[in-house]
């Protein structure tokens, strides 16, 4: 695919969160970016702006509705002149441990947690990987279509989301095992993961190649688990 015959969707992770108690904040409200987090997302926004100066056409911006992702989208709005559209489909994964300070000692001394740890392949402590991929796939495909409708060939969209949904999306696209070590995720704070699609995917009224690719690769990943 050439640059002009593709639609790109960039998945940007939010910046560092102010969380001195080291709580699993998940979808809890009220968790803002730290000062360092603000600097992180500013640098990411400046990278998008630099690409725009070199000819990239960013025409659509989506963000998770949580405070940290809205704040992360703000400098992108400022530098690219876009308005972020909140989308529940790119929100953080649901997690049983929300609101807790989780460590090995906490898990060992509280048997009530044990039943949530029996199946890391699903995972049993939160939203399933399958559900995450389905909602993210739909959101990414809609963002790509909107970018194409607004900007035609070569247009680009940005989605500001969270580490696990972004990483699971990448694993699904690449057909890799969904069960993984969280320490091995290649999705740092304020990082950018880019997906590219051929514009031929959007020449029909109801393109479904992306969703089909996602679900096919997901099945491969499940079989390999």
Predicted regions and their residues:
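Acidic, low-complexity terminal tails and accessory targeting/binding regions
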Residues: 2-8, 82-85, 92-105, 149-155, ...
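Short coil-to-beta-strand
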Residues: 5-16, 106-114
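Active-site-proximal alpha-helix that buttresses catalytic centers in soluble enzyme cores
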Residues: 7-83, 133
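Generic beta-sheet signal
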Residues: 9, 59, 152-163
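Active-site metal-binding loops of divalent metal-dependent hydrolases
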Residues: 15, 163-164
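Active-site catalytic microenvironments for nucleophilic, acid-base chemistry
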Residues: 47, 75-79, 142, 146, ...
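Glycine-rich phosphate-binding loop signature in dinucleotide/nucleotide-binding domains
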Residues: 51-57, 143-155
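Phosphate-handling substructures
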Residues: 77-138, 224
């Amino acid at each position: 695919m050439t640059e002009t015959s593709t639609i790109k969707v960039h998945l940007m992770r939010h910046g560092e969160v102010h969380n001195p108690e080291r709580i699993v904040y998940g979808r809890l409200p009220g968790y803002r970016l730290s000062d360092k987090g603000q600097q992180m997302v500013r640098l990411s926004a400046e990278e998008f702006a630099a690409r725009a100066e070199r000819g990239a056409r960013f025409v659509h911006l989506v963000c998770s509705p949580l405070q940290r992702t809205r704040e992360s989208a703000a400098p992108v709005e400022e530098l690219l002149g876009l308005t972020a559209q909140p989308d529940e489909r790119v929100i953080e994964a649901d997690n049983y441990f929300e609101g807790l300070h989780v460590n090995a000692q906490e898990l060992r001394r509280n048997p009530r947690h044990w039943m949530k740890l029996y199946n890391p392949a699903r995972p049993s402590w939160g939203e399933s990987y399958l559900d995450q991929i389905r909602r993210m796939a739909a959101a990414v495909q809609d963002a790509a279509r909107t970018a194409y409708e607004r900007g035609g060939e070569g247009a680009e969209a940005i989605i500001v989301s969270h580490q696990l949904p972004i990483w699971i999306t990448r694993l699904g696209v690449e057909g890799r095992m969904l069960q993984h070590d969280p320490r091995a995720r290649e999705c740092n704070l304020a990082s950018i993961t880019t997906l590219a699609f051929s514009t031929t995917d959007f020449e029909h009224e109801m393109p479904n190649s992306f969703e089909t690719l996602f679900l096919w690769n997901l099945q491969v990943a499940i079989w390999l688990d």
